[in-house]
Amino acid sequence: MSPMNRQRKNKSNVLNEKDERPGCIIKEKSSVRSMAKTQPTSGRTISLSEINKPIALSKKNTEIKAAVEIQNRLTKKMAKNSERRKKMAHGPEMTAQNRTQERIDFVEFLDRHYQVMQAGVSTVKVHKMHYTKEEFENVIYEAQTIFSSEKALVDIDPPCVVVGNLHGQFNDLINMFILLGRPPETVYVFTECVTSIPKCGEEIWALFQRCFNNLPISALIATKILCMHGGLSPALTCLDELRNHPKPIRNPFRGIVNDMLWADPDPSVFEWKTSSRGSGFTFGTNVIDDVCKRLGVELIIRAHQMCFDGYWVLSGRKLITIFSAPMYCNFYKNTGCVLKVDETLGIQTVAFVPESENIEKIIEEMNRVWDISIDCIE
């Protein structure tokens, strides 16, 4: 049984459990209706690392042979382009010396995004944003400068808002800022696994890749709430291993970073099990309890899996999975969810309900999504 199916079956029982453990307080969910219909983000991406080897066929069929020769040439060209992109992504970091343009006004830059949105009105036309190459380079440079100066484990002071997977639904991100508070006045912790697809020019794509190499692995809120994208690692023994992990981090394929990007909780697993994703592990509820005790944290917040309700609670409320993209890809009738953490580490779930006919009835039939009768942990 998949985690999502187990969620539908067991969630009502999990949410009504009482936990005498002091500290983090999970409050009832408040719902926020989505302001604009999400633009589809679906698409097909071909992995250049999985290119087939050249095919050898008989010389009898000249047409097939000609087709195979064309395929082999394209395969070699794609492989060559892939190697060039790898070299570009691992090239020198952008610095003030190799950056020629003047700095942009980031206040004005952000205001452009807010001006094309209007909270609470679904009929507003959402215009696409257009950027110059100089704007791309400025934003990437400033972000890379900040990321490079931070540890791999970032310490966050509450209050803040924790966001899960958005999957490129940019309109929902801007709507979130409008409703819950605009940065930098409101602090946001993103557990999204950021990727960059080379469709905006190889040079800009490479700049994004080098910037992303400096992103932190996880965040620690008030020393008690640990946030990451995927999950836990059997190699993780203390928080200093995360805090002191060297950066930049380039394409980890094993170890703590890889596990924390790919791992998933699974109540049917006793301890650890190799993940069916092909990378990382699945881990059971006893692992969650042990890790919280060993690291001295009271709650783990992660993303990485879609939840129709927007969130999924495990292990006596010691682990929460959140999914923040409502109406995912304009296909799933799901709710998005974020977590608001206040100064006392009280946690409130905020639901972003997509505008659709009978959406409340649809989701209620799935799992009674935003039930305000959920008990608080006192």
Curated annotation (Swiss-Prot):
Annotated Gene Ontology cellular components are: cytoplasm; nucleus
Residue span of region Disordered? 1-23
Could you tell me which Gene3D superfamilies the record lists for this protein? Answer: 3.60.21.10
Which GO terms of the molecular function aspect are on file?
protein serine/threonine phosphatase activity
Domain of life from the UniProt record: Eukaryota
Record-linked InterPro entries? Calcineurin-like_PHP_ApaH, Metallo-depent_PP-like, PP1_catalytic_subunit, Ser/Thr-sp_prot-phosphatase
Bias category Basic residues: which stretches? 1-11
Q: Which SUPFAM superfamilies match?
A: Metallo-dependent phosphatases
What Pfam families does this protein's entry cite?
Answer: Metallophos
What organism is this sequence from? Caenorhabditis elegans
What is the designated name of this protein? Answer: Uncharacterized protein C30A5.4
